[in-house]
A protein has these predicted regions:
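Conserved class I S-adenosyl-L-methionine
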Residues: 32-41
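A short acidic, Gly/Pro-enriched loop at the edge of an enzyme's catalytic core
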Residues: 88-100
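A short, conserved alpha-helix within the catalytic core of class I
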Residues: 108-121
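Helix-to-beta-strand junctions that scaffold the AdoMet/dcAdoMet cofactor pocket
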Residues: 110, 126-128
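Class I (Rossmann-like) S-adenosyl-L-methionine-dependent methyltransferase catalytic domain
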Residues: 1-28, 41-52, 58-75, 80-86, ...
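A structural alpha-helix within SAM-dependent methyltransferase catalytic domains
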Residues: 47-50, 119-123
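A short beta-strand submotif of the Rossmann-like class I SAM-dependent methyltransferase core
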Residues: 102-105
Length: 201
C-alpha cells in the first residue's frame, strides 16, 4: 500500500464543493441515502453529507484512509481498493447505492477494457433512478502529478505527491460521456456547467 500524502492534506476542491452543493439543492430529501465515494481525499463529502446518510468510500491512498479513520464518523465505511482492479467489488450490493461520486471517472493509467468493466459495475450497484456524478474538470487533466521525496521531523523522509504544470489533455470528452450513456442505457444531464450526471433508468 502506498503511503503518498497529498489529497488528505488539501483543502476542499471546487469539484467536491460543486457536487455537494448540487446534491443539497437538486436531490429530493437527501436523507437515508446510500452513497459511494470513489477517491475519498480529505473526506469532505462525508463530513458534509453524512448526517442523514450512509457513505462507503474507497481509496488507493493509505494516508487518506488513516485520516478518515481519525475523524471517527459513524455510518462512514472506507477501505483500500483500486476501482479498476477488483471486478467482484460490491457484488453484495447490487442495486444498492443511490449515488456514486467519482470526480475523476477515468485516468490515463486505465485501459478502455478496464474502464468499461468498472463503469458496468457502477451501473449494477446503483438502484433505479440512482446517479453517477463526475466533475467536468475531472474529464481532463492539466497537470502532471508524481511522487517526490520530502522531509518532516514527524515522518523524516517520505514520499508525497506534487503537482507540476503540464499539457491539457482530455481523458473523456462530453461526446464520450454521451456515448457511454447510450451504451449503458442511462440518462445523462449536461445542464450543469461543472458536472456530468448519469441516471439509471
Amino acid at each position: 500500500k502506498r503511503n503518498f500524502s497529498y489529497w488528505e492534506s488539501k483543502n476542499v476542491t471546487n469539484d467536491e464543493r460543486y457536487i455537494v452543493d448540487y446534491l443539497n439543492t437538486h436531490s429530493e430529501a437527501l436523507e437515508n441515502k446510500n452513497i459511494l465515494h470513489v477517491g475519498i481525499g480529505n473526506s469532505y463529502v462525508a463530513k458534509k453529507l453524512l448526517s442523514y446518510n450512509k457513505i462507503d468510500g474507497i481509496s488507493l491512498s493509505q494516508n487518506e484512509l488513516d485520516y478518515a479513520s481519525k475523524l471517527n464518523l459513524s455510518n462512514y465505511n472506507f477501505f483500500f481498493q483500486n476501482k479498476y482492479a477488483n471486478q467482484n467489488l460490491f457484488d453484495d450490493k447490487l442495486n444498492f447505492y443511490n449515488i456514486i461520486i467519482d470526480i475523476n471517472l477515468k485516468s490515463f493509467g486505465c485501459c478502455e477494457v478496464a474502464f468499461n468493466k468498472m463503469f458496468k459495475k457502477y451501473v449494477k450497484i446503483i438502484n433505479k433512478d440512482g446517479k453517477i456524478i463526475t466533475s467536468r474538470s475531472g474529464l481532463k487533466w492539466s497537470r502532471i502529478i508524481k511522487p517526490v521525496l520530502s522531509f518532516s521531523f514527524k515522518n523524516f523522509f517520505y514520499k508525497r505527491l506534487k503537482e507540476f504544470d503540464g499539457p491539457v489533455s482530455n481523458i473523456l470528452s462530453i461526446q464520450n460521456c454521451e456515448e457511454i450513456s447510450k451504451k449503458f442505457n442511462l440518462d445523462i444531464d449536461l445542464s450543469d456547467q461543472n458536472l456530468v450526471i448519469f441516471t439509471k433508468k
